[in-house]
Amino acid sequence: KTEDTVISFLNTEMTKERGSLLNVLKNGIEISNQKLNLLYRKPATTFNKEANRLYNENIFSVMEEVVISDKERIDLVIFVNGLAVISMELKCNHAKQSYHDAITQYRTERDPKNRLFRFKAGCLVNFAMDLDEVYMATKLDGESTFFLPFNMGNGTGIEAGAGNPIFKDKYSVSYMWEDILTKDT
């Protein structure tokens, strides 16, 4: 079956020693001398109608409560053309949870060998976030997983600090869906 052949080849390309999800997204794959592009980048201009048409054919999708094993589920996974590229653990400060809980969850409950989290072959980035702050890791490695802040910073000049600005009419992490998690970024 063609679909099974493509999936098998894709998995092989992403999991081999010098392979990666990023590489197959950037360069596509070749099967039986046929190039298969897995992502079309945004053209620099609108002059090339075909390049723009192909870019607009990319399919971005979001799944919530993605089951990754009998006992595990991830809050959100974002896909590009069917390939998982971002995982997110979301916590609500009002429920007395924070991004710290999401980081702990990634470090202690997520198996780095799981296909979704496998370094270079799984999601490109894993976000731990609450309503105020966002942290990211590109490699899950159990307790050794290192998370970096993915915040805008708060304040300006010598008053600048960590975290995000506080807004009256939206969440401090609204930049994630307004600016970061958009088709063009």
Predicted regions and their residues:
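ATP-dependent helicase/translocase motor core
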Residues: K1-T185
